[in-house]
Amino acid sequence: TPEGYGRVRDIETDPDLTVIDAIIANGKIQNMDAILLHLAKMKATHGEGKLYASLLTNVDFNNAFATAKNIQNKGLLLYGPFVRSGTNCSRFVAAVIKASGPSFIKRIRLKYPFCISPSPKRNVCITNHHYYVVENQKCIQVKKSKWKAYFSSIEI
């Protein structure tokens, strides 16, 4: 993409993006560690350093997916955290989460972030106070109370 622009990618548009199918039993993803370790290794899905991830349950997947595809179908997008009417990875993720129908509090926290623009870590901690950190080929699950997660750093 040209300088200052980005685009939404998926396995149809970028063959180097691969995903591991979730194994679900009793309503829970059984291979979450394997999925996250795979994503953390891929330069196409993750920059450098720790990977943070969380799960959002009870969502409208179809609406979230349609929102992601609608943004993707726009083609090249102005890219940057402070670009008006533009996007970046965190803004894209926040838009898709909002479209999934989260609770009122989560929608408000996503719409009005503490910082000027959504950030990856903020999206993770808004989504769930139980989250994952992947570093050095290890996947750690962090469980905090809602209160502690709201007022403390996501760092472990």
Where are these regions (language model features)?
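Non-catalytic ligand/cofactor/substrate-binding and regulatory segments of enzyme domains
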Residues: 1-78, 141, 146-156
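Activation targets extended, charge/polar-rich intrinsically disordered C-terminal tails
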Residues: 69-156
